[in-house]
Amino acid sequence: MSLSSLPGSFSSSSHPLVPYGWDADWEAEFAPYDSEGLLAGRVIRVDRGQCDVVTPGGMLRADTAFVTPHDPMRVVCTGDWVAVEPAGDPRYVRTYLPRRSAFVRSTSSKRSEGQILAANVDYAVVAVSLAVELDLGRVERFLALAWESGAQPVVVLTKADLVPDATTLSYLVQDVETAAPGVPVLSVSSNLGEGLDVLAAVLSGGTSVLLGQSGAGKSTLANALLGEDVMKVHATRDVDGKGRHTTTTRNLLALPGGGVLIDTPGLRGVGLWDAETGVNQVFSEIEALAAECRFHDCAHTAEPGCAVLAALDTGELPERRLDSYRKLLRENQRIVAKTDARLRAEIRRDWKRKGAEGKAAMEAKRGQWG
């Protein structure tokens, strides 16, 4: 049975895939495969050459052998929309639809290949534990990748109930806001249920990926948002707030208030992958200052008329911010030097085109971010 012949095509909000992010644009993209009798579905989980896919008829298991190229940037991942064979043993994923966005980090290989953690994401939720000392540099690193993905970053400060008083919590939020210009910063306590309604409202109607290092409280937060204990939770060490990987695979789950959530394993290593635009977005105040420098190619080291150094001298720009900016730019330049520029440009063009279309669709449904 073709997708368009199912009762309640996309024009009806009762379409089985709407809760997982299906919309008119995805339906149009899928039309050629629909005419071939293939099933539309969204990848819920990928595991060793197979994936779980939610389709109009329910959940099924499919083999990814036909869509497993040598390029790790083009393999099927959680969040992809795919065309699946309607029957067979095994049944195969035949292709995936062009991605609107993708969250990518570099691998530890000498070739510095990119690793896709999640696809077609609207919000990148960076979970930061308040049970340990804030690492603003790590927050900035996550945000650079989030901005580069095409998603809207959101920082969620978890375990707020462990902060001794409201004044201290306010200062911590302000510190993170300074490191995250243009990014909503929310504090929550999954144990007490505080702040969850606000976060759920933000994430409703879109696809969100939940990111953070081990021990950040991601699985506890995911369970609180889902309203049930879906993700396993392990205890963290009091001394450093770290714990074992609770989530070992990337899972996509429908939220009760609307939207879907992709939970990822705790990330100990978060390398940049062609994220210059994202870095510039995180440090937008430095980019604005750089535009005022006397020389267009100013390196902000010792040049006369450097607006960045002037702001550093007056205290307008914290030295920590400038150091972090330089560090991330240097790292990104090393990664870029090792990778195929033509391939990167091709992938980025495709994502930006689809991302613009996806953002327009989201704004039409929900209105722009307030």
Swiss-Prot record:
InterPro entries: G_CP_dom, P-loop_NTPase, Ribosome_biogen_GTPase_RsgA, RsgA_GTPase_dom
Domain of life: Bacteria
Family annotation (PANTHER family): SMALL RIBOSOMAL SUBUNIT BIOGENESIS GTPASE RSGA
HAMAP family per UniProt: GTPase_RsgA (MF_01820)
Residues engaged in binding GTP: T158, K159, A160, D161, G212, Q213, S214, G215, A216, G217, K218, S219, T220
Encoding gene, per UniProt annotation: rsgA
Described function: One of several proteins that assist in the late maturation steps of the functional core of the 30S ribosomal subunit. Helps release RbfA from mature subunits. May play a role in the assembly of ribosomal proteins into the subunit. Circularly permuted GTPase that catalyzes slow GTP hydrolysis, GTPase activity is stimulated by the 30S ribosomal subunit.
Species: Streptomyces avermitilis (strain ATCC 31267 / DSM 46492 / JCM 5070 / NBRC 14893 / NCIMB 12804 / NRRL 8165 / MA-4680)
Designated name of the protein: Small ribosomal subunit biogenesis GTPase RsgA
Subunit structure: Monomer. Associates with 30S ribosomal subunit, binds 16S rRNA.
Magnesium listed as a keyword: no
Domain CP-type G intervals: 111-270
Gene3D superfamilies to which the protein is assigned, alphabetical: P-loop containing nucleotide triphosphate hydrolases, Probable gtpase engc, domain 3
Cofactor(s) required for function per UniProt: Zn(2+)
Region forming the signal peptide: none
GO MF assignments: GTP binding; GTPase activity; metal ion binding; rRNA binding
Annotated PROSITE patterns: ENGC_GTPASE (PS50936), G_CP (PS51721)
Positions of Zn(2+) binding: C293, C298, H300, C306
UniProt keywords, alphabetically: Cytoplasm, GTP-binding, Hydrolase, Metal-binding, Nucleotide-binding, Ribosome biogenesis, RNA-binding, rRNA-binding, Zinc
Intracellular or extracellular location(s): Cytoplasm
